[in-house]
């Protein structure tokens, strides 16, 4: 199929009139359709249903290849009267759940999602060609969310995950896919490795003579990341005084160098990562609640490798070939 294409499948009863109306609406919006090959299902696809059952959930899991393929589940109005919830279908493998009310409106929604998904899959294909390993459904789903937030938003991102889950890989992918014009560099700062006495200089930079050993002026992370992305790894290790200073820069987008009196403007995308539970730290008074809400506009939890069994052999081959 050329252009935007998908398969369409009716789960349950559907009149010929309903099928004809949907087919005409899809053609009107330049969406090509094909029958579902149930022997070798591939996405994207549309499944229209009138009742949520265990068999429907099993079907969605099968045709989505356990989440690998993009499926839109469209609920006819009678399906909603049962009090069922769409999240059951999302858990089963559907990428989105829509409601069949106004047909033209729902088809416009379908087209918008298909166009966005095509863009995201192209971005992911480029990332995988550049060395990102993604075979497991759970990791593919995570990378899709990362790609979508990176390309279609400039919001701050908080990456959560155990050590070794690929937090820096995710941060670099966000920076790589960021669509800002004239985007500059990715600046990486490991908060756990910053010497407390020099933390101000690391973030804000310093003027010549600001302290013993400051023989020349030096730009800090806020200056270097201007126009680009600032990645704060292990952000949970920041001491409270520095948290307050970071919060102010995020809010005001301006700072002073250590030993300086001039305000400097900075604009950057903020990506933070940690293996700690920041909400528990907030409860204990170890992490500022206002800073947490600033850095966590979008939260991405990375699955550990034990939940990505399909990626183990490809990862081993990748590391072997690059060694």
Please name every model-derived segment:
Residues 71, 157, 186, 229, ...:
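Hydrophobic/aliphatic anchor position in the core parallel beta-sheet
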Residues 65-72, 154, 182-184, 267:
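His-Asp phosphorelay/catalytic-motif detector in bacterial-type signaling
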């Amino acid at each position: 199929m050329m252009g935007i294409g998908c398969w369409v499948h009716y789960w349950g009863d559907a009149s010929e009139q309903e099928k004809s109306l949907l087919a005409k609406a899809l053609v009107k919006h330049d969406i090509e359709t094909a029958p579902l090959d149930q022997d070798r299902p591939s996405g994207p696809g549309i499944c229209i249903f009138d009742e949520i059952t265990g068999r429907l959930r099993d079907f969605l899991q099968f045709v989505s290849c356990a989440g690998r393929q993009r499926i839109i589940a469209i609920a006819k109005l009678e399906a909603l009267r049962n009090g069922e919830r769409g999240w059951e279908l999302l858990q089963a493998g559907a990428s989105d759940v829509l409601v069949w009310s106004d047909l033209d409106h729902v088809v416009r929604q379908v087209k918008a999602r298909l166009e966005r998904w095509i863009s995201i899959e192209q971005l992911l294909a480029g990332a995988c060609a550049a060395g990102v390993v993604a075979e497991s459904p759970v990791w593919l789903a995570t990378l899709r969310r990362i790609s979508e937030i990176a390309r279609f938003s400039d919001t701050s991102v908080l990456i959560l995950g155990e050590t070794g889950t690929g937090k820096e890989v995710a941060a670099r992918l966000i920076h790589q896919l960021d669509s800002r014009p004239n985007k500059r560099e990715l600046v990486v700062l490991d908060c756990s490795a910053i010497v407390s006495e020099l933390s101000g200089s690391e973030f804000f930079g310093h003027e010549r003579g600001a302290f013993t050993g400051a023989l020349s002026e030096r730009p800090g992370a806020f200056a270097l990341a201007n126009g680009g992305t600032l990645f704060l790894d292990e952000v949970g290790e920041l001491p409270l005084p520095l948290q307050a200073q970071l919060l102010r820069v995020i809010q005001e987008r301006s700072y002073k160098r250590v030993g300086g009196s001039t305000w400097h403007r900075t604009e950057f995308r903020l990506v933070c990562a940690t293996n700690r539970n920041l909400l528990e730290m907030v409860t204990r008074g170890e992490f500022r609640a206002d800073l947490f809400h600033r850095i966590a506009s979008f939260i991405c939890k990375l699955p550990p490798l034990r939940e990505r069994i399909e990626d183990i052999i490809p990862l081993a081959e990748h590391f072997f070939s690059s060694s």
